[in-house]
């Protein structure tokens, strides 16, 4: 009989189970407390009970644990300085959606060479999340793969569904099961309605099929996630201006949803020019100063060194510089946080 299945499978390997990974990289009670407390604070910001500003800031993607932890230590000092006005959460992205092809993140390919040592990558990612949370600094990530969350979601205080997957039914179902607040980005073309629809979908109960913590395929029934929100990330044109925020808030209001939202300073809003994140920050700071309650949070791409670099086989990488999207450097990151903290002082 002719074989009819797995005709295009090149390799199959065994993946560590979530309990085995958790046993190798356990969560302490103090870290668990840090995660749950941060989730509660973020939820209060997203419902308008807390008028501070959520700031999700960090590298486009993480590829070097040492540089990531140094960045986290610096950021944590600023978190403590501004905690009366800003809820600073470190962007810790281990999965990268690609428009066509490219490096898909530290979990998939930790050695940056196409060897796909996923078991090693997922261990590095989990330990790094533990180390960052141990500082007292909460972490945020994008949930892209439907299985990866089983390995790291217990360490995440805020999650995002990206522009390419906001309209995906399975990602909306996954968001309904996640224990943290989840932001949905508008589409790559700027369509905000798909993010509003995603929030509505994620608030509902869903049934979907997924492996459980032991790897057994399971029928999941979710209770829904009440803390979904829109992330304005730009599209064919930027959408961070006051008129854009008002239009998005009106779309949310039409369905009796909380009108608080997050503005991404990068991607379409900075026209893919990383330095323009500072211009976006200045405009959004003015909205906050003017008393806008709709701007509940912002996202910023930032690392130790400005810009980005290509991975070239046999050549060393610049320490602390992104290998995906270009980022603000540390000095500009300090400036943007000071600017936002000062703006929030006017609305508290």
Swiss-Prot record:
Judged by the first EC level, this protein's enzyme class is transferase
- Recorded GO MF terms: 3-deoxy-7-phosphoheptulonate synthase activity
Q: What does this protein do?
A: Stereospecific condensation of phosphoenolpyruvate (PEP) and D-erythrose-4-phosphate (E4P) giving rise to 3-deoxy-D-arabino-heptulosonate-7-phosphate (DAHP).
UniProt source species? Enterobacter agglomerans (Erwinia herbicola)
The reaction(s) catalysed by this protein are: D-erythrose 4-phosphate + phosphoenolpyruvate + H2O = 7-phospho-2-dehydro-3-deoxy-D-arabino-heptonate + phosphate
> Recorded E.C. number(s)?
2.5.1.54
Q: Which residues form a coiled coil?
A: none
The protein's annotated pathway: Metabolic intermediate biosynthesis; chorismate biosynthesis; chorismate from D-erythrose 4-phosphate and phosphoenolpyruvate: step 1/7
Its GO CC terms are: cytoplasm
> Which InterPro entries would you find in this protein's record?
Aldolase_TIM, DAHP1/KDSA, DAHP_synth_1
Q: For this entry, list what GO says about its biological process.
A: amino acid biosynthetic process; aromatic amino acid family biosynthetic process; chorismate biosynthetic process
Lineage top rank: taxon: Bacteria
| Record's keyword terms, sorted | Amino-acid biosynthesis, Aromatic amino acid biosynthesis, Transferase
What protein family does this chain belong to? Belongs to the class-I DAHP synthase family.
Can you tell me where the transmembrane regions are?
A: none
Taxonomic lineage:
Bacteria, Pseudomonadati, Pseudomonadota, Gammaproteobacteria, Enterobacterales
Q: What is this protein called?
A: Phospho-2-dehydro-3-deoxyheptonate aldolase, Trp-sensitive
């Amino acid at each position: 009989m002719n074989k009819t299945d797995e005709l295009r499978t090149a390799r199959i390997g065994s993946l560590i189970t979530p309990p085995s990974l958790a046993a190798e990289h356990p969560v302490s009670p103090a870290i668990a407390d840090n995660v749950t407390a941060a989730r509660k604070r973020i939820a209060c910001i997203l419902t308008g009970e807390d008028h501070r500003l959520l700031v999700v800031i960090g590298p486009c993607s993480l590829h070097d644990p040492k540089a990531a932890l140094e960045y986290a230590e610096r950021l944590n000092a600023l978190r403590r300085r501004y905690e009366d006005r800003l809820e600073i959460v470190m962007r810790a992205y281990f999965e990268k959606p690609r428009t066509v092809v490219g490096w898909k993140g530290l979990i998939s390919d930790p050695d940056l060479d196409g060897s796909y040592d996923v078991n090693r990558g997922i261990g590095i990612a989990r330990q790094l999340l533990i180390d960052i949370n141990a500082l007292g600094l909460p972490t945020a990530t994008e949930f892209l793969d439907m299985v990866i969350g089983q390995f790291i979601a217990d360490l995440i205080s805020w999650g995002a569904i990206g522009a390419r997957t906001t309209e995906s039914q399975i990602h909306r179902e996954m968001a309904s099961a996640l224990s943290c607040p989840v932001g949905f980005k508008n589409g790559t073309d700027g369509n905000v309605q798909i993010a509003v629809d995603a929030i509505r979908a994620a608030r509902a109960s869903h049934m979907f099929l997924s492996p459980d913590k032991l790897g057994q395929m399971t029928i999941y029934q979710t209770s829904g996630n009440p803390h979904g929100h829109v992330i304005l990330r730009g599209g064919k044109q930027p959408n961070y201006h006051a008129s854009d925020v008002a239009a998005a808030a009106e779309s949310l209001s039409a369905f009796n949803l909380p009108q608080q939202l997050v503005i991404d300073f990068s991607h379409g809003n900075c026209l893919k020019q990383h330095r323009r994140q500072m211009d976006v920050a200045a405009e959004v700071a003015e909205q906050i100063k003017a008393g806008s309650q709709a701007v509940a949070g912002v996202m910023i791409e930032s690392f130790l060194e400005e810009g980005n670099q290509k991975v070239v086989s046999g050549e060393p990488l610049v320490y602390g510089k992104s290998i995906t999207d270009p980022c603000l450097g540390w000095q500009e990151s300090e400036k943007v946080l000071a600017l936002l903290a000062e703006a929030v002082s006017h609305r508290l």
